[in-house]
């Protein structure tokens, strides 16, 4: 019976307590008994109670953290934009207060005169000319706000009065009376008159051009402006490339990185190149180049301009070319002549890639075909330095399959390499009619892949000179037959 047992235990405890109080038992035993009773009377925490209290503490901490994060996010989303909106509206009101517009008749009169007059100049320090987006108003500094405030705040083209005819005639007489080709004076005048001036070619559509004959053509790739002059004392042809306009876009951004190469044909060893102008379709070069040539030889020479789009990671794209001949019909030497020429689109078939000279020799008894790569000339420049690192690769082909291939050594930094290297293939007489040779002039690139400058073929399946050269080799066995071959684009 649990109740009788508890009562019995309770009586025993009372008896022991009385004995301890009377001193009938030892003091140490009584102290142990008292401590034991005190421990039994003290409440004990159970394990489930401890786990519940810890869980409550963790949940409380997480709740406080989430509450703090929600307060921070709400402050960022609500308070900060509201404050910025208030500041922006205040500044906008302040900016709109000083705007003063003239009468309607005055505005209409000014708008009608915008396309007839050049613009009013502003200080150099207070403006930044944009060649790519002419419709955006110019940004001024605080020092130039008084002079250019109207041009900044009102998106309308303001022009300056045109110079009088008397001034133009005086300037023309001064230029014609001076036989010297003063480049610095031309550049200084262009800088003074070009600041803040609206360029008409940026605003005109390609179907509407001025009276200078600059009409767009379906195959034209813009126009090139240059100046020609002949120096009789030094016997030099002076060429100044001024600018190009309306070039086609070659990059994904809608712009190009143009530069110009110049040759005085038929000499390709003397080559000049302008600087690369980044991200523009209307580059201004203003560079002068000299070509030593006798005056009597000008009639037989041709001035060749090639406009390229610079590409840092791949082959440069040819935009177009300009060829100038019959100098005496175009220019009144020794006086300077300003010319505008259309940049003509050039297909791959018309690109001059250079020429390769090699000889062919076949020994029927030994069944040995020898091709000797002699030299190349006027190769196309593939590097940014204006040169190439060419080598020649020869492949023995049969029914479209390459049987063997050989290559020459690489000549560094040249467009006119000399090889004099022989390459031998074993070809039996019964197979000589089924094979042909594919010759490729390559540009060695240390970093990327090697690029093909041009190719040519010889054999029964070749065209024109390639077939004739092969037939001549078979007609004269054991005799080297050499010819120059023009390089073509790889198809």
From Swiss-Prot:
Ca(2+) 3 binds at residues 311, 314, 317. Ca(2+) 2 binds at residues 251, 309, 311, 317. Coiled coil: none annotated. InterPro entries: C2_dom, C2_domain_sf, Synaptotagmin. It holds the Pfam family C2. Ca(2+) 4 binds at residues 383, 389, 443, 445. CDD domains: C2B_Synaptotagmin-3-5-6-9-10. Residues 91-104, 127-144 have a biased composition (Polar residues). One of its GO terms (molecular function) is SNARE binding. Residues 105-116 have a biased composition (Acidic residues). Its cofactor is Ca(2+). Belongs to the synaptotagmin family. Homodimer; disulfide-linked via the cysteine motif. Can also form heterodimers with SYT3, SYT6, SYT7 and SYT10. This is Synaptotagmin-9. It comes from Rattus norvegicus. The gene is Syt9.
